[in-house]
Amino acid sequence: MATVTAALVKELRERTAAGMMECKKALVAAEGDIELAIENMRKSGAAKAAKKAGNVAAEGAIIIKEEAGVAALLEVNCQTDFVAKDAGFLAFANEVAEVALAERLDIVALQAKFEDARIALVTKIGENISIRRVELVEGVALASYRHGEKIGVVVAGEGEAETLKHIAMHVAASKPEYVNPSDVPADVVEKEKAVQVEIAMNEGKPQEIAEKMVIGRMKKFTGEVSLTGQAFIMEPKKTVADILKEKGASVTTFVRLEVGEGIEKAAEMSFADEVAAVQKG
């Protein structure tokens, strides 16, 4: 049996980021062959990651990376808020975002590129990790805003940096779905209109009054779901359109990501339960 030296264990730790005892065990099993040990650890890690894949990963972080004219927004998920704050998890998420920006990768290419690193992180941390979404935003002028690490926004348009930054903050808080009322898709408008017509008819209003009510309610609806039609959070008596006009600014597009959107979350765990879950693996 080959001797497993401390130097060999140290090298394996540096190359895999695995724990000391795990590295020693792998080297003993591989009879001191570090390349075989790494191969075996990767196979073991892939098996563990496959078992974790069914676990709901609805926590995590939103990362934003920017360079001239382009920004990348990334969502990386884990199972618990405890792990979402882990330095290793955040380092992984930041590296993925940097590569997404530098290489302009879509989500499929990004997931493929980082699959080995993801498996290694799952093995180390003991939770399911998912590279869920990436959005690339281009524009003449860009502004970004992150609310903690849970919400991220990038706004593209024209105007002063401070103005666009405030618009990004508004998007984070108010969750508009479209830039302008006219951008609301026809099918969405028709669906809402049908609802409002039924409501008006059920209220027993005369047809002429009901039609006017529906027109008013639809104008309100398209305003509420669009950025420029919303009341500006910092000056509620004005709309975002008013603010943009005053500042000589405009918005062409925006992207807002929030951790866990659309994912059905499991019952919330206490902090103690989260720690216990991480320790159990």
From Swiss-Prot:
Principal subcellular localization: cytoplasm
GO molecular-function terms, A-Z: translation elongation factor activity
Source species, domain of life: Bacteria
Subcellular location as annotated: Cytoplasm
HAMAP family assigned: EF_Ts (MF_00050)
InterPro entries assigned to the protein according to its UniProt record, in alphabetical order: EF-Ts_dimer_sf, Transl_elong_EFTs/EF1B, Transl_elong_EFTs/EF1B_dimer, Transl_elong_Ts_CS, UBA-like_sf
Family statement: Belongs to the EF-Ts family.
GO cellular component: cytoplasm
Keywords, ordered alphabetically: Cytoplasm, Elongation factor, Protein biosynthesis
Region entry Involved in Mg(2+) ion dislocation from EF-Tu, spans: 80-83
Protein name: Elongation factor Ts
